[in-house]
């Protein structure tokens, strides 16, 4: 485990309200969201970098999944978006005196433990922000912030550019980090079909649901 106290924040939208662009049945959507979340939590847990993981959600299925990995549960009364969810996670980790946090979405199923370690090891100064963008460079797929409260997040607003610009305004060093497996998130069926081409167990699990 790192000498730094590293926390992971995983905002989870209610499975049945998530991924509507997949155009799948509610049952299949819920199964796919569950498989993806399990893959993300597994990678975090096995990375030997993250001391504690927080799931912010109002979905009981997500919390039940989190229990398998010892995740802390923060219940959202209302789903007010990713930024609000991250803010709740921030409050927890600042109160617990963690040195840095990494925000991971629920929909990057290809992520591996070594990807988490790589991102952590790329941090520079003790005041830094690292952004892993989405494959389409239209969002932020992982966000490392040190210290944990160095800045608020700006998801859903051309976020990766804004995160880098905000870091500069906060006098934090920043960098865009390209980690292919983290960059591939699932928003629609084209993304999902791309995931299915990968020779990984999670791809097989997703395929069994998608093609059933």
Model-derived segments and spans:
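N-terminal nucleotide-binding beta1-loop-alpha1 segment
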Residues: 1-22
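Conserved alpha/beta core of the MobA/IspD/sugar-nucleotide pyrophosphorylase nucleotidyltransferase superfamily
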Residues: 2, 168-212
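A short, N-terminal amphipathic alpha-helix
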Residues: 34-49
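Acidic donor-binding segment of Leloir-type glycosyltransferases
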Residues: 48-72
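Short phosphate-binding loop-to-helix
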Residues: 67-100
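The conserved acidic donor/metal-binding loop of glycosyltransferases
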Residues: 105-109
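Conserved donor-nucleotide/metal-binding helix-loop-beta segment in metal-dependent transferases, i.e.
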Residues: 111-137
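Short, glycine-/small-residue-rich phosphate/pyrophosphate-handling segment
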Residues: 144-167
């Amino acid at each position: 485990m790192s000498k730094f106290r590293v926390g992971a924040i995983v905002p989870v939208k209610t499975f049945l309200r998530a991924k509507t662009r997949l155009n799948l049945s509610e049952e299949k959507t819920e199964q796919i969201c569950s498989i993806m979340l399990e893959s993300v939590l597994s990678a975090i847990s096995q990375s030997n970098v993250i001391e504690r993981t927080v799931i912010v959600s109002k979905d009981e299925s997500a919390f039940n999944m989190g229990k398998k990995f010892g995740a802390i549960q923060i219940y959202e009364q209302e789903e007010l978006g990713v930024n609000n969810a991250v803010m709740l996670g921030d409050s927890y980790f600042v109160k617990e005196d963690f040195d840095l946090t990494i925000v991971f979405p629920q929909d990057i199923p290809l992520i591996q433990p070594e990807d988490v370690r790589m991102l952590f090891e790329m941090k520079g100064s003790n005041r830094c922000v690292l952004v892993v963008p989405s494959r389409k460079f239209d969002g932020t797929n992982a966000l490392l912030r040190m210290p944990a409260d160095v800045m608020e997040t700006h998801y859903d607003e051309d976020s990766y550019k804004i995160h880098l610009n905000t870091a500069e305004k906060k006098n934090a060093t920043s960098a865009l980090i390209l980690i292919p497996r983290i960059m591939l998130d699932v928003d629609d069926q084209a993304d999902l079909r791309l995931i299915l081409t990968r020779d990984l167990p999670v791809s097989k699990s997703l395929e069994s649901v998608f093609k059933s």
